């Protein structure tokens, strides 16, 4: 009988130690820091930085990523008060967030483009799904 009790005690101890080790792995995975750039979770995106050069236009830049004329027109209407598309400036930086297109895997799909108006202020253009959105924000000083 004593042997039986010892075997049960050992089994319970083994099970509880195994359960504790699984919990610690789950906690470690949950605590993994996210890569946030301009308020966007950059994990899963290819992030590229560019500088506006002479001759660049928003229409041309966005067209090179397959953004349709209709979406550019919607973007133009949304940005009139925030950052008119005509105000693109040579030397200013912009960042693209792209990932592989699920239908055409040879093409990169643009989800976000961030334009730095100056060293502090930036504008995020979002093209996720059929949605076109714009938000203005600033870096912490």
Segment roles from a protein language model:
Residues 20-141:
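Intrinsically disordered, low-complexity regulatory tails and linkers that flank structured modules
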Residues 1-18:
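Sec-dependent bacterial lipoprotein signal peptides
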